[in-house]
Swiss-Prot record:
Its main location: membrane. It is found in: Cell membrane. Keywords: ATP synthesis, Cell membrane, Hydrogen ion transport, Ion transport, Membrane, Transport. This is A-type ATP synthase subunit F. Component of the A-type ATP synthase that produces ATP from ADP in the presence of a proton gradient across the membrane. It is a peripheral membrane protein. Pfam families: ATP-synt_F. One of its GO terms (cellular component) is plasma membrane. Has multiple subunits with at least A(3), B(3), C, D, E, F, H, I and proteolipid K(x). Belongs to the V-ATPase F subunit family. It comes from Thermococcus onnurineus (strain NA1). GO terms for biological process: proton motive force-driven plasma membrane ATP synthesis. The keyword Lipid metabolism does not apply. GO terms for molecular function: ATP binding; proton-transporting ATP synthase activity, rotational mechanism; proton-transporting ATPase activity, rotational mechanism.
Length: 102
């Protein structure tokens, strides 16, 4: 299974250097947000993609498809995380069906 990354230029470069299989860079413009949405939908349909990483900022703009596979994880960009513990709990709950508690 492959890992795909959708993010801004800096995030994409970091994950490319870390060895992500497919990396796509987008700017924060209306045209690029449309391209991003199309690319995300394309990746969700592919059977060889197991994990999609997408920056939190872009998720706030385009939303996420309601799928159980591939796993879609939100990652912070260079400006830091917008979410936190609750978002991570929700990701785990959706991915494996277990609710994390303190």
């Amino acid at each position: 299974m492959k890992i795909a990354v959708l993010g801004d230029k800096d995030t994409a470069l970091g994950f490319k250097l870390a060895g992500a299989h497919e990396v796509y860079s987008f700017e924060d413009t209306p045209l690029d947000m449309e391209r991003l949405k199309n690319k995300l939908n394309e990746l969700v349909e592919r059977e060889d993609i197991g994990i999609i990483l997408i920056t939190e900022r872009f998720v706030q703009k385009i939303g996420l498809p309601d799928v159980t596979f591939p796993i879609i994880l939100q990652v912070p960009d260079k400006s830091g995380s917008k979410f936190g513990e609750e978002a991570i709990k929700e990701i785990v709950r959706r991915a494996i069906g277990v609710e994390l508690k303190r």
